[in-house]
Amino acid sequence: MKKTATILSNIAQKYHVFIGSSLQLLESSTLPVNLTINDMSASKTVKEVLDTLCLIKQINPHTYNKYEYSEEELAEEYKEIEPSKNPDVRYYACVVDKNRAGAKPTLLFRLNLAYNIWEELGYLRLKQEFLD
């Protein structure tokens, strides 16, 4: 995996193009906001080659009450994740595990499966009462 990623990285640099890839996460009980490179089923060494690594996992609707989000990274007020009446809508946590260009936030996305529309809602975190 690392060898293939290195070859693709060299091609991207040489031709000034973006190359994106999707890798499977392990089946685990890790909370979406706590994802790390160890939750990837592929070779962990692939991270060394990547410029950016985003780990994305669906948030279980039964656990929406454990999370809150805001439009600013350090906010005074946070919003609840509102369950959608639309059965095609899902919420996803995106943990930026590596970013050579800057910050590594944890973001909340809303996905409409019917239209494949991803909407970034803001910065996601566990509510204070659910922190270890």
Show where each model-derived region lies.
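C-terminal regions of RecA-like/P-loop NTPase motor modules
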Residues: 3-15, 27-132
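Structural recognition of the conserved hydrophobic beta-strand(s) that form the central parallel beta-sheet
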Residues: 16-24
